């Protein structure tokens, strides 16, 4: 039996009550009070309650079990997802098993709350792409999870529906080029992409064909979305087309190299023979559709290239430029995973499609169709 913490003597003396007086109130002898204070006698429930009442405290203030030592965290070595920001000891990470190795992905930070995580980086910093992590749940092997790299905010809707089906989706925020590179390196199960080939006008398939051996990757449509110019609410700068981005009174926020939205902007600037040096803010980047739209909403930029859904989240204006497919590229050896099969089934569910379309700018009629 664990030793009981006993504060009876301390509290009695603090109240200025003699052992004899307390003994009378509790219905015991003075010797019993001394024995309890010495820890050689444990009172029954009735005596403990009378003692607490006499001293005007709770029973647990008098007698308590010592606090259990915290369970030690399990230490594991994990592969740091390439392209992650520099890690520091104690940084939260999410974990997923991909091709039998444990991959650590730092969740995207949100200023208002701690990110959902499975472990923290240990004091030993990453070396050769690997790092030690301290795992919270010793019983979790992180196998019933899918690690997906992509930039479509709508993937969070898919994650919510998958969670209801018992599958966890871990999202690593990357642009299209970065996502395909991670898939090629075997670091993720799925890469989300929207890269338009300028010569053919086709989306995603040409780039995937260049990067991967034939028949090694399946391509599934996630949705067709609208991309365009996101403006401040009410469009105070009267921006109507790409040409207006070269005006001196207009400032944009761009996307990073490799992003489909940046490629869309560049192709339009090239078509119109506009030098990017004449576009104010061209070299300032935001890592994502929602982040770019937030820059506009907060007044840090007059416009950006993003999706209609991103504009709608912040109540911003939107000028459509094109509709394009956002596809999911999956290594064929992963197609038979039960979790992947659940994901593909979810893409065809009407309740999921309705929710995604309600965000604005999404057409899900082709969702779940296999293109390759």
Provide a role label for each language-model segment:
Residues 141-151, 243-262:
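Short loop->beta-strand "edge-of-pocket" segments that line small-molecule binding or catalytic clefts
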Residues 194-208, 293-322:
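A ligand-binding cleft/hinge motif common to bilobed small-molecule-binding domains
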Residues 157-165, 243, 248, 261-281:
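Ligand-binding cleft/hinge of the Venus flytrap
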Residues 2, 9-13, 18-21, 29-34, ...:
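N-terminal hydrophobic or amphipathic helices and topogenic motifs
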């Amino acid at each position: 039996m664990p030793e009981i913490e006993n504060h009876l003597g301390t509290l009695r003396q603090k109240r200025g009550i003699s052992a004899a007086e307390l003994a009378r109130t509790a219905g015991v002898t003075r010797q019993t009070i001394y024995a309890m204070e010495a820890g050689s006698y444990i009172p029954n429930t009735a005596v403990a309650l009378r003692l607490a009442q006499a001293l005007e405290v709770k029973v647990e203030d008098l007698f308590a079990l010592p606090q259990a030592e915290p369970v030690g965290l399990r230490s594991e070595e994990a592969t740091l997802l390439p392209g992650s920001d520099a890690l520091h000891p104690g940084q939260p990470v999410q974990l997923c098993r991909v091709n039998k190795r444990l991959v650590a992905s730092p969740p995207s930070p949100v200023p208002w709350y701690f990110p959902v995580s499975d472990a923290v980086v240990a004091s030993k910093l990453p070396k050769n792409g690997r790092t030690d992590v301290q795992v919270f749940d010793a019983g979790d092997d992180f196998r019933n999870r899918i690690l997906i790299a992509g930039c479509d905010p709508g993937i969070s809707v898919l994650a919510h529906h998958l969670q209801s089906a018992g599958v966890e989706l871990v999202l690593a925020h990357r642009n299209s080029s970065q996502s395909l590179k991670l898939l090629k390196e075997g670091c993720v199960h799925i890469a989300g992409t929207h890269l338009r080939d300028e010569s053919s006008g086709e989306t995603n398939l040409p780039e995937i064909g260049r990067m991967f051996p034939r028949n090694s990757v399946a391509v599934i449509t996630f949705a067709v979305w609208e991309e365009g110019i996101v403006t401040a609410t009410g469009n105070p700068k009267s921006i109507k087309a790409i040409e207006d981005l070269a005006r001196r009174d207009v400032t944009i926020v761009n996307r990073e190299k490799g992003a489909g939205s940046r490629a869309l902007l560049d192709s339009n600037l090239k078509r119109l023979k506009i030098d990017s040096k004449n576009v104010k803010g061209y070299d300032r980047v935001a890592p994502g559709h929602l982040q770019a739209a937030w820059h506009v909403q907060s007044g840090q930029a007059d416009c950006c290239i993003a999706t209609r859904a991103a504009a709608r989240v912040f109540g911003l204006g939107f000028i459509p430029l094109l509709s394009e497919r956002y596809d999911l590229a999956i290594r064929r050896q992963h197609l038979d995973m039960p979790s992947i099969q659940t994901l593909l089934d979810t893409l065809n569910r009407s309740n999921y499609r309705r929710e995604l379309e309600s965000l604005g700018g999404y057409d899900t009629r082709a969702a779940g169709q296999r293109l390759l």
